[in-house]
């Protein structure tokens, strides 16, 4: 019974992920494309920005659904991989962008106020669930975040992008 409660707590916590993502999207959407295109040679369109974010929301809903139905080591690891890409690395990107630009960048407020605390909370719930070993969760977080971290580095410091 205690194991089921631990599993259920992390599953319930993940239900907030789509809402937190939408809050972040709403904050960054009015000015992100303009900000992004000021940093890279190969810019993006508003349409691409919307498609990427709608796809990210769909993936988030699928990942949360898989966790809710499965509640397995795989589903929890998948959730950590995805949230590490979507929230952890994205938050680092927005915070880094704020330091590089020395001013507010679109998405910075929700990255700091929602993404960082929410991701930390979910990660700790995942650890406490004891469903996946902590080292495996750390590896999942690194693997999930690496592409977005490289992408962010290229944008902020090289004027290019990975995808």
Q: Where are each of the predicted segments found?
A:
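Membrane-interface helix caps and helix-loop-helix hairpins in membrane proteins
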Residues: 73, 95-106
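Interfacial loop at the N-terminal end of multi-pass membrane proteins
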Residues: 23-52
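Membrane-interface helix-boundary motifs at transmembrane edges
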Residues: 4-8, 67-77, 126-136
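Hydrophobic cores of alpha-helical transmembrane segments in multi-pass inner/ER membrane proteins
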Residues: 16-17, 56-63, 113-124
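Hydrophobic alpha-helical membrane segments
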Residues: 82-94, 107-125
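Core segments of transmembrane alpha-helices
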Residues: 53-70, 87-91
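N-terminal signal-anchor transmembrane alpha helix
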Residues: 7-27
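Terminal transmembrane helical module of multi-pass membrane proteins
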Residues: 121-163
């Amino acid at each position: 019974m205690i194991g089921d409660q631990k599993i259920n707590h992390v599953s319930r916590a993940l239900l907030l992920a789509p809402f937190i993502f939408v809050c972040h999207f709403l904050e960054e959407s009015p000015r992100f494309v303009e900000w992004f295109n000021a940093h890279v040679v190969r810019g993006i369109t508003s349409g691409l920005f919307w498609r990427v974010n709608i796809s990210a929301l769909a993936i988030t809903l699928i990942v949360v659904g898989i966790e809710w139905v499965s509640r397995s080591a795989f589903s929890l690891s998948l959730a950590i991989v995805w949230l590490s890409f979507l929230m952890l690395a994205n938050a680092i990107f927005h915070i880094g962008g704020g330091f590089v630009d020395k001013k507010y960048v679109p998405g910075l407020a929700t990255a700091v106020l929602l993404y960082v605390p929410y991701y930390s909370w979910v990660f700790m719930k995942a650890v406490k669930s004891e469903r996946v070993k902590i080292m495996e969760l750390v590896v999942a977080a690194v693997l999930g975040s690496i592409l977005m971290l490289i992408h962010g580095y290229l944008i902020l410091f090289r004027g290019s992008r990975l995808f």
